[in-house]
Amino acid sequence: MSYSKKQGKSNLPEERDYKQEFLKGDKPFLMCSDCGSVYFNKYWHHKIEEFNKLEKENNFQMKFKLCPACEMIKNKQYEGRIVIKKIPKKLEAELGKVITSFTRTAFEIDPLDRLIDIKKGKDSWEVTTTENQLANKLARKIKEVFNKIDVKHSFASDPSDVVEVTVEFK
């Protein structure tokens, strides 16, 4: 049996291009309805510009949902808690600056790293964060800046990820 070029269209489906073949079509992107962070490529991102570029290249649809950090804040939950005791009055302002600047930098790197609250009491401060590692790193930073400090870590039993750090000025 011979085939000629004049046979006309075959019953085979038309060739598909790369996007049709390998990209799965409508991929949902998640945007936090509270802070505006966007979830794509398996991570939460600040940079909406990256999303806009990808959206033009592919066929994506946006879905709105709270990111894990905003959800924790809404539910009054935390993963990191630092209790700072015996704070000298003359160091309170500097300590506040260290905490806010360190957590702001962490947030700029990762939108899920957040300072939830600083509760200032008579004898101690309670700092809560959305990530346990952020609390550990913040305690290390406080020790590095102020030197004469005792730091004690305690971890909640499984399945919880909560870390509680006690920082005490000498």
Label for each model-derived stretch:
Residues 9-12, 59-64, 95-98, 105-107, ...:
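A short linear-motif detector with a strong N-terminal bias
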Residues 73-134:
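Extended interfacial segments that mediate partner engagement and assembly in macromolecular machines
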Residues 44, 125, 165-169:
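Tryptophan-centered motif/residue detector
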Residues 1-75:
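N-terminal cysteine/histidine-rich coordination modules
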Residues 43-46, 78-81, 138:
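Generic domain-boundary/flexible-linker signal
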Residues 2, 23-24, 31-34, 38, ...:
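Long C-terminal interaction/binding lobes of large macromolecular proteins
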